[in-house]
């Protein structure tokens, strides 16, 4: 992997985690491409870009590396947040999470990852592990298939996940299956991009930009963002397979959002590549993912204290609540990114 490509991947990771944090604060950097319409698909896409085919013949090594890089740190953080949650419950009277037991500690992470509210964004980590291991085995099965046939199979997986989620009951296990089908498509897309498109075709021409913007304008006709309860536009919630009435729009907005992210990196690379803080964000996406809600909680507690408001006020809202968002959203964002990085 040459340095320029490695730097671009790191900046892309930084952008993806910035979109996650901004999404949890209910604002968007790219007004036409809101984060909840594509940011997690972007992470899966990046994982596909980084997938190495040498592991097709070394499954044990691949799983060992993924356990070490994803799951080991996950359960260390999970233990930490179990302690934090217990302490906060004693201090504030609010237990932010599910009951403490072995099932919720070891099994729930692989079902929905919401055993502790303060670390619930980490559901993505266990899902990424499931998706990447599944992708490895599927690639082993499909290694003799043509690129066209593989592309058809993965595309059918991605586009059929949403309809299936509406036909069958979303049991905990079936929810994992739906998320895995949806995410596999974007892992494959990232891998396909690196193998077949990157370095061979220029997909960032003015004509393609125009096509993407026109498509996104059409997709906005399916926007539900006319009521605050619906979030920040074109959103879907992958962890719960919450796609509302949409069938293919979430897949399409994920594709347009990923393309725009790649385009953004292409046109800003020469400026961003030398900014140390951007590099650090890209290198610390795991820790930012794990800790940003806790940092926001602490910021809220400090603001409440400074305003003479009891911490019990925080207990009456969900984990994503921030104090006076009209004035404080960007303060939360800047402080959270600095502290977690």
Q: Which positions does each model-derived feature cover?
A:
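Alpha-helical transmembrane segments and their immediate juxtamembrane cytosolic regions
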Residues: 1-341
């Amino acid at each position: 992997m040459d340095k320029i490509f490695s730097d671009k991947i790191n900046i892309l990771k930084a952008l993806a985690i910035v979109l996650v944090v901004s999404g949890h604060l209910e604002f968007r950097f790219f007004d036409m491409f809101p984060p909840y319409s594509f940011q997690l698909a972007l992470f899966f896409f990046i994982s596909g870009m980084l997938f190495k085919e040498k592991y097709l013949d070394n499954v044990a090594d691949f799983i060992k590396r993924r356990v070490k890089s994803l799951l080991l740190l996950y359960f260390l953080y999970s233990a930490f947040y179990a302690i934090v949650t217990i302490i906060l419950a004693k201090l504030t009277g609010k237990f932010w999470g599910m009951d403490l037991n072995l099932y919720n500690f070891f099994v729930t992470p692989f079902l929905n990852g919401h055993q502790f509210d303060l670390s619930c964004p980490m559901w993505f980590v266990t899902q990424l592990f499931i998706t990447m291991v599944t992708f490895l085995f599927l690639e082993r099965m499909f290694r003799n298939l043509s690129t066209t046939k593989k592309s058809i199979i993965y595309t059918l997986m991605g586009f059929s996940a949403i309809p299936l989620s509406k036909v069958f009951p979303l049991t905990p296990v079936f929810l994992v299956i739906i998320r895995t089908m949806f995410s596999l498509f974007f892992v494959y897309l990232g891998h396909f991009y690196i193998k077949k498109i990157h370095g061979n075709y220029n997909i960032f021409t003015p004509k393609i930009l125009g096509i993407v913007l026109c498509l996104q304008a059409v997709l906005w006709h399916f926007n539900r963002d006319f009521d605050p309860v619906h979030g920040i536009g074109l959103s879907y919630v992958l962890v719960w397979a919450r796609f509302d009435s949409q069938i293919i729009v979430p897949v399409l907005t994920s594709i347009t959002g990923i393309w725009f992210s790649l385009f953004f990196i292409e046109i800003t690379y020469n400026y961003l590549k030398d900014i140390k803080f951007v590099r650090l964000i890209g290198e610390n996406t795991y820790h930012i993912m794990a800790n940003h809600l806790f940092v926001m909680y602490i910021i809220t507690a400090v603001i409440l204290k400074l305003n003479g408001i009891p911490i019990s006020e925080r207990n009456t809202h969900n984990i994503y609540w921030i104090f006076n968002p009209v004035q404080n959203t960007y303060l939360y964002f800047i402080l959270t990114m600095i502290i977690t990085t």
